[in-house]
Amino acid sequence: MTLADLVPGDTAKLEKIDTHDPGVIKLMILGMVEDITVSMENIAIGGDPLEVGFFGSSVSLRKEQARHFKVSRI
């Protein structure tokens, strides 16, 4: 399951990150690293972008980027 598969209200643990996308590296610099808990806050009309919360903050990312984050639902 990937971050892109979550729906608003879901909470998950980041298990593995595919770092082949430069945009994913930027998100990791912001704190989206393995073993943290994230929550799907909102999905825009049309399904893109996604708003993801972690460490008391939220970031928006494209669904294509979210597919690089493997998660397990909590």
What are these regions (language model features)?
Residues 1-2:
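Absolute protein N-terminus
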Residues 22-26:
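Short alpha-helix capping/helix-loop boundary micro-motifs
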Residues 45-74:
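C-terminal structural segments of small proteins and small subunits
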Residues 15, 31, 51-54:
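Short, acidic/hydrophobic/Gly-rich beta-strand patch recurrent on exposed beta strands
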